[in-house]
Amino acid sequence: MGETPFWKTKGLEEMTGAEWESLCDGCGLCCLNKLEDWDSSEIAWTSIRCTLLDGESCRCKDYDNRQATVPDCIQLTPKAVREISWLPPTCGYRLVAEGRDLYWWHPLVSGDPETVHAAGISVRGRTVAEDGIDIEDYEDYLVTWPLEVGREPAD
């Protein structure tokens, strides 16, 4: 038997930088633009991706400098993960913060960064870049799929 995975034995604050970064499954969901209803505070998801999110790799094109280009980019920290209500239900950070295990398709579990895409979790092929889209038109891009958990592997 191997060692117990770090995400089952460490709190978010105890993780090394590399462990923390590896909790990201590469789905790209957190980089989708969202709308908030001012009256109810309800969050609605759009299929519009951040200008820095690569729609195929589902990774940031300039991760280290992202906040210089996108000032309202949210940097996830253990505190932020516990406070942000809109993190998708499949988010590795959210799952670990809630004391839950990672899904089968998470690269730390599967050993393959492509399983997040094969399971239908990621934004790959389902988004449009925000460049050139007026904020008034965002409602035309509302979607619910970011709240879905994904497909089980075929036997």
Swiss-Prot record:
Record Pfam families: CxxCxxCC (PF03692)
InterPro entries documented for this protein: Puta_zinc/iron-chelating_dom (IPR005358), UCP006173 (IPR008228)
Residue intervals passing through the bilayer: none
Sequence similarity: Belongs to the UPF0260 family.
Protein known as: UPF0260 protein R01011
Phylogenetic placement of the source organism: Bacteria, Pseudomonadati, Pseudomonadota, Alphaproteobacteria, Hyphomicrobiales
